């Protein structure tokens, strides 16, 4: 974008602005938003000061940020994102916005140069005093000394929470001399101490817990945007006591007990960890002299104000709404007089003393004495929307008037295509600027602004894809590392105390933890399991592969089995019979598919390439891979049967559209089958829009079509006139005949009834089939389905998708009003989820009173199908602002303009349901908001509380996401295998079911389990060999290490585990060293045919297999073991070699030496 800024800065009009920009009370009028951004960016580039840009709300700040990213390096652009909803302090929220706020405050506190965008709400927000913030920024360097206790206290003050293992943002842990920290900004870091000196600093991966790169120094930012120290708490307690005493006599007697409870709950501050999420609502009482963000700026900072009059309008509501919210919570006994989140000074007072430049599109009166007024003439650009003739004449006008024409397109490919198009129009154009740009020609560059603009006095016009082709600007993602790092998923198999488990031989029990037991004077670790009644089972950790976590549907609580009973055997037998039946069906399907002959498509045509280049967005890697897999299938003679699995809005439709186009280009017809009329309409419109420039006849068959139109479509399918038909189950009517059906696309097949599914089966015969689903299919299950259906998965979201900002808070009408107003003010729409049909119309009336100007509709499952569809269609077409609805919106509704979701009584929903509902919003380039409300003062059940806790972690990839994914995987398994199997999965748990199915399928196909080259080795030595709690306190980490040791088969793996232990837990004690020695002995034994190593008190007994006995080179062995002398004796038992080793000092070393010699004798024998 340097071309554009070069043209701007050389112009006299900009130079006039530049001279007075940054002087007190300057007004600049006439500039459109994108033109204004260009000027501000250039001013920033030419100055050495901090520049503060103030907007009226966060939505406007986001829009300006997107354009500014085209001119300013992301490292120098900062935003202070505060919701326009004052009550956000009362909610649990996603960490993304907080990490941006912390990044901004930290840069300001360090005096960094930058352009800072702050909405009015952020300008007024009470903050930690500047000096306190500066004192809590830490830079650690290798070789420095630290006071560990002081350092850990500081982390707590900064909002970090102490855990045994760090797995989430904002956590830290101490294990021996190792401190792990996961800051909100940057990589997780591991600090290793030598006494009090920092010996090393390393990045580490939270998923593997392994160190990555060494660094010399690291900045540790706070994990909260408030610093809370012991002194702050002490001051807070005094202020809170006064506020409580002032409030109590002034409220109704009936709520005084509630107020007392609120006061008492706030008094229970733990000194080890201050809950910043709760304390933030008491910010007005926390600091003697709180700051606002303006005090964080340098004294010579420049201020630019975007649309002063809009800011003053917003300021009015910012004063009224918090007042009414605070009044509400005080009246209900949930708040105190004096509680506030913002400074109530007016806007002008807040920015007093700084040079301010005001930007306004129109010249309006302002209550400010202005020193300079700069007027620009700026026009919007003609909207061409792909109309070639209009585009040519307008470009010709610019050339004739000697304009500098800047054309912005979003990819390199489009730069080339645009140049070719202008060349056809005989418009001179270039794509690179060598020295200076001549007027009367176009320069085409890669870039993007929210809109184009024309500055006639400068002779400059900027044209974007929005004007050229009606494309929306792609949201630029300014990423700090915090987001990319957010919550890596660990397996849902993590075992926690109290979890249900399945033991292969004993059935369903409950995991009670790892216990160290002394058996025969030897300490070992055992997994403790609880069964029915008082039955308990201790499983040695080396047999832990027999224990799996019980995974089933979210709402399924299993029944504990009785130890030693026949109940579990009967259950397994019943499931076994069922999986064998399914295996039989799968084998038949597999054979049928292998035999079938279908149409074999050729390579992509030139039209296909042109069509694909017309897609206005970059494909994600997963989309590209899925398209390649589908085309490969189509180019084979065997009919395709592929399942395309991807979250809602991840671009499955575009993949399907390309497959459809390929089929049509070879003269084949395509049927696109969808479960609802609304979806049919949406897919139909997408296809029409994507294929408008190509000779493809597309028709729709649904209730939105007249009988006459349906009849014509049927005729067109029969004669071959119609290429693509989109429709609901009407497509499955027996009276529909295709001339040459080549591809059937089925969206969400599981939503069709049994009769329709049978009809789909008959249609599938010898035709390529692509099935789309948003319900994830477990890979393990797919593997056991042996390719009856191929699977493609889209797991990465499109580039311009942002994590939905998620809030969990108590129900409150003034908050709901704010949330609704904020979404409607950005011309968006709202889903309001209320799951009680009997009172849903009363809820609508209640919301209508709150929002008298809003158009509110109702949708629920008891409406007639036609009424429901008409309502939904009206909502999609933007005829309603708010849709009060039940969970019927959970699947299959695409409303990109609806970006706020409010759910009442969220504690009553399952996590997977909440996950899918949340997927309704945030599906355009705007940030989506989801508000999960639960009733105030309601005593929640333990399950609901756990669920809300999980939802609180329900950010980009939190543990709530894992649980939702688990439940959805099981739902996906049920969809694939049928309802009855869903029940069997719940009986024995998902993992054991998958294992049994895979075994049954392999048996039917005659595939035997590959027999191990060597038998299982039993090593039984009377040694204390385990992981002591003093060394690894976290049980999950302990189990994880035991699992790795159990699977170890090579010496490289042993070295890797040793490195990991030292990396994560520091030097290991003697018990761990012995455990590693035993694993090393076992690896030697595995490679040399040893079947048993048993400690018999004074001797060690070693048994070899018959095969190993035949292969060993005895001469080599005896030579190698001479140092052992008479302590070693060799014998033969049942044609197999036995060796006894007499125990002496250092006998463990002797044993290691002996098994190594046996292995080498075996190797030499093999080589000979």
Swiss-Prot record:
Any keyword DNA repair?
A: yes
**What Pfam family is a match, any one?**
TRCF
Instruction: Give the superkingdom in one word.
Output: Bacteria
Q: Give the main localization category.
A: cytoplasm
Q: Where in the cell is it found?
A: Cytoplasm
Biological process per Gene Ontology, one example term = regulation of DNA-templated transcription
Leading EC class? hydrolase
One GO CC annotation, please? Answer: cytoplasm
In this chain the Helicase C-terminal domain maps to 808-969
The record, for CDD domains, names:
DEXHc_TRCF (cd17991)
Similarity-based family: In the N-terminal section; belongs to the UvrB family. In the C-terminal section; belongs to the helicase family. RecG subfamily.
- Function noted in UniProt: Couples transcription and DNA repair by recognizing RNA polymerase (RNAP) stalled at DNA lesions. Mediates ATP-dependent release of RNAP and its truncated transcript from the DNA, and recruitment of nucleotide excision repair machinery to the damaged site.
Would you tell me the protein name for this molecule? Answer: Transcription-repair-coupling factor
The organism's lineage?
Answer: Bacteria, Bacillati, Bacillota, Bacilli, Bacillales
């Amino acid at each position: 974008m340097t071309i554009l800024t070069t043209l701007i800065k050389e112009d006299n009009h900009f130079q006039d602005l530049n001279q007075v920009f940054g002087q007190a009370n300057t007004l600049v009028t006439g500039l459109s938003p994108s033109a204004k951004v260009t000027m501000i960016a250039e001013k920033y580039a030419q100055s050495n000061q901090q520049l503060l840009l103030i907007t009226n709300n966060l939505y406007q700040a986001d829009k300006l940020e997107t354009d500014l990213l085209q001119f300013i390096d992301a490292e120098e652009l900062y935003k202070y994102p505060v919701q326009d909803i004052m009550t956000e302090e009362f909610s649990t929220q996603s960490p993304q916005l907080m990490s941006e706020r912390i990044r901004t405050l930290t840069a300001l506190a360090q005096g960094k140069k930058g352009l800072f965008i702050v909405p009015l709400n952020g300008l007024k927000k009470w903050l930690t005093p500047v000096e306190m913030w500066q004192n809590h920024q830490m830079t650690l360097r290798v070789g420095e000394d630290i006071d560990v206790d002081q350092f850990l206290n500081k982390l707590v003050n900064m909002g970090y929470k102490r855990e045994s293992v760090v797995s989430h943002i904002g956590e830290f842990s101490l294990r021996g001399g190792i401190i792990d920290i996961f800051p909100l900004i940057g990589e997780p870091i591991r600090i290793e101490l030598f006494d009090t000196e920092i010996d090393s600093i390393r990045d580490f991966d939270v998923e593997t817990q392994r160190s990555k790169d060494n660094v010399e120094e690291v900045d540790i930012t706070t994990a909260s945007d408030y610093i809370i120290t012991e002194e702050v708490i002490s001051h807070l307690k005094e202020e809170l006591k006064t506020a409580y005493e002032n409030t109590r006599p002034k409220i109704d007697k009936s709520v005084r007990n509630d107020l007392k409870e609120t006061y008492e709950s706030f008094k229970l501050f733990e000194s080890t960890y201050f809950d910043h999420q709760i304390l933030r609502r008491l910010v007005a009482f926390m600091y003697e002299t709180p700051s606002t963000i303006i005090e964080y700026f340098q004294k010579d900072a420049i201020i630019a104000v975007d649309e002063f009059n809009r800011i003053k309008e917003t300021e009015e509501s910012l004063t009224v709404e918090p007042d009414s919210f605070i009044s509400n919570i005080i009246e209900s006994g949930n708040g105190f007089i004096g509680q506030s989140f913002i400074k109530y000074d007016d806007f002008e007072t807040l920015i007093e003393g700084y040079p301010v430049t005001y930007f306004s599109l129109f010249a309006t009166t302002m209550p400010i004495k202005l020193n300079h007024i700069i007027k620009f003439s700026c026009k919007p650009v003609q909207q061409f929307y792909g109309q070639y003739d209009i585009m040519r004449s307008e470009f010709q006008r610019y050339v004739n008037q000697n304009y500098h024409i800047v054309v912005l397109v979003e990819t390199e490919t489009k730069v080339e295509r645009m140049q070719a198009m202008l060349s056809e129009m005989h418009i001179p154009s270039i794509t690179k600027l060598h020295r200076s740009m001549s007027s009367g020609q176009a320069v085409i560059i890669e870039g993007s602004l929210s809109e184009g603009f024309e500055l006639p006095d400068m002779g400059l016009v900027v044209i974007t894809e929005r004007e050229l082709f009606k494309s929306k600007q792609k949201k630029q993602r300014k990423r700090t590392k915090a987001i990319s790092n957010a919550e890596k998923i660990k397996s849902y198999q993590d075992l926690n105390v109290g979890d249900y488990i399945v033991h292969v031989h004993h059935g369903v029990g409950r995991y009670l933890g790892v216990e160290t037991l002394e058996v025969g004077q030897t300490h070992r670790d055992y997994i403790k399991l609880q069964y029915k009644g008082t039955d308990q089972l201790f499983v040695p950790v080396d047999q832990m592969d027999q224990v799996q976590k019980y995974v089933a549907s979210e709402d399924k609580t299993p029944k504990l089995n009785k130890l030693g009973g026949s109940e579990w055997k009967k259950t397994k037998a019943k499931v076994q019979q069922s999986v064998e039946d399914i295996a039989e069906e799968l084998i038949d399907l597999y054979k049928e598919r292998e035999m079938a002959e279908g149409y074999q498509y050729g390579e992509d045509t030139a039209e296909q390439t042109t069509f694909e280049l017309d897609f206005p967005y970059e494909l994600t890697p997963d989309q590209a891979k899925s398209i390649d897999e589908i085309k490969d299938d189509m180019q084979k003679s065997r009919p395709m049967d592929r399942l395309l699995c991807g979250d809602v809005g991840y671009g499955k439709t575009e993949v399907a559209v390309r497959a459809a186009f390929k089929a049509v280009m070879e003269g084949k017809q395509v049927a696109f089958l969808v479960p609802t009329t609304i979806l049919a309409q949406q897919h139909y419109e997408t296809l029409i829009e994507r294929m408008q420039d190509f000779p493809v006849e597309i028709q729709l068959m649904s209730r939105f079509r007249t009988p006459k139109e349906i009849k014509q479509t049927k005729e067109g399918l029969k004669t071959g006139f119609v290429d693509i038909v989109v429709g609901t189950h009407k497509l499955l009517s027996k009276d529909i005949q295709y001339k040459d059906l080549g591809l059937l696309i089925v969206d969400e097949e599981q939503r069709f009834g049994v009769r329709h599914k049978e009809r789909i089966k008959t249609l599938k015969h010898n035709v390529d089939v692509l099935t789309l689903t948003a319900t994830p299919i477990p890979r393990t299950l797919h593997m056991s389905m042996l390719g009856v259906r191929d699977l493609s998965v889209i797991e990465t979201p499109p580039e311009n998708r942002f994590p939905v900002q998620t809030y969990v808070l108590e129900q409150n009408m003034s908050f709901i009003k704010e949330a609704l107003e904020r979404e409607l003010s950005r011309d968006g729409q709202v889903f309001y989820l209320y799951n009680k049909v009997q009172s849903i119309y009363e809820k609508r009336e209640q919301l209508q009173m709150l929002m008298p100007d809003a158009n509110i509709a109702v949708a629920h499952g008891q409406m007639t199908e036609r009424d429901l569809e008409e309502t939904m269609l009206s909502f999609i077409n933007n005829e309603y602002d708010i849709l009060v609805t039940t969970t019927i919106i959970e699947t299959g509704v695409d409303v990109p303009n609806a970006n706020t979701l409010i759910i009442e009584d969220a504690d009553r929903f399952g996590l997977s349901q909440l996950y899918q509902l949340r997927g309704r919003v945030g599906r355009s380039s705007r940030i989506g908001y989801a508000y999960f409300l639960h009733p105030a003062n309601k005593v929640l059940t333990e399950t609901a509380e756990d669920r809300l806790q999980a939802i609180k972690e329900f950010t980009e990839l939190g543990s709530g996401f894992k649980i939702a994914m688990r439940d959805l995987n099981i739902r996906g398994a049920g969809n694939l295998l049928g309802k009855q199997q869903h029940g069997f999965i719940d009986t024995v748990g998902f993992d054991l079911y998958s294992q049994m199915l895979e075994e049954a399928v392999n048996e039917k196909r005659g595939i035997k389990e590959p027999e191990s080259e060597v038998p299982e080795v039993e090593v039984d030595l009377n040694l204390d060999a385990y992981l002591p709690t003093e060394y690894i306190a976290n049980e999950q980490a302990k189990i994880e290490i035991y699992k790795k040791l159990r699977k170890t088969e090579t010496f490289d793996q042993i070295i890797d585990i040793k490195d990991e232990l030292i990396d994560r837990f520091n030097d290991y004690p003697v018990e761990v060293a012995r455990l590693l020695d035993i694993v090393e002995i076992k690896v030697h034994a595995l490679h040399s045919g040893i079947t048993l190593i048993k400690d018999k008190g004074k001797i060690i007994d070693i048994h070899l297999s018959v095969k190993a006995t035949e292969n060993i080179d005895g001469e080599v062995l005896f030579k190698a073991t001479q140092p052992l002398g008479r302590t070693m004796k060799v014998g033969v038992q049942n044609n197999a070699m036995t060796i006894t080793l007499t125990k002496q000092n250092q006998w463990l070393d002797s044993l290691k030496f002996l098994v190594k010699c046996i292995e080498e004798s075996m190797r030499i024998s093999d080589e000979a």
